[in-house]
């Protein structure tokens, strides 16, 4: 019997796969527990519609990520952060990704998740720093961060 898996079943199939399984296994285990449903015409057309919707959603996310990448990598987009610094232009403390995201939201009204900022270690010195941001699996942007000493 051909079935469409609704959930991942270890050793048998992943969600959305169409496979041939023994009739008894399909009726008594998979279908009864909601792990799969019979692969008839209506179920197949529903699966195809879900796949098309998923592809459309993926394309929209990619387009949004590319648009955001253009806005972030624009020459005018420089995130300025004011911090206390010593004489040797080293900061008292550091600037983590959370602070960069908050400054970006405050200055340019661009909301980002702090986990997308790929900062290997917090910024500890004054000046310009290019910070990579993973917007999508295929799209990575660079934010220019300018750390300025706080006037006393």
From Swiss-Prot:
Signal listed as a keyword: no
Basic and acidic residues: bias regions: 49-61
Gene3D superfamilies named in the record: Ribosomal protein L9, C-terminal domain (3.10.430.100), Ribosomal protein L9, N-terminal domain (3.40.5.10)
GO biological process: translation
Stretch list, region Disordered: 41-61
GO CC terms in record: ribonucleoprotein complex; ribosome
Transmembrane segments: none
Organism (species): Levilactobacillus brevis (strain ATCC 367 / BCRC 12310 / CIP 105137 / JCM 1170 / LMG 11437 / NCIMB 947 / NCTC 947)
Sample GO molecular function, one term: structural constituent of ribosome
Keywords per UniProt: Ribonucleoprotein, Ribosomal protein, RNA-binding, rRNA-binding
Name assigned to this protein: Large ribosomal subunit protein bL9
Family statement: Belongs to the bacterial ribosomal protein bL9 family.
InterPro entries cross-referenced by the UniProt entry: Ribosomal_bL9, Ribosomal_bL9/RNase_H1_N, Ribosomal_bL9_bac/chp, Ribosomal_bL9_C, Ribosomal_bL9_C_sf, Ribosomal_bL9_N, Ribosomal_bL9_N_sf
Function, in words: Binds to the 23S rRNA.
Domain of life of the source: Bacteria
HAMAP family in UniProt: Ribosomal_bL9
A Pfam family: Ribosomal_L9_C
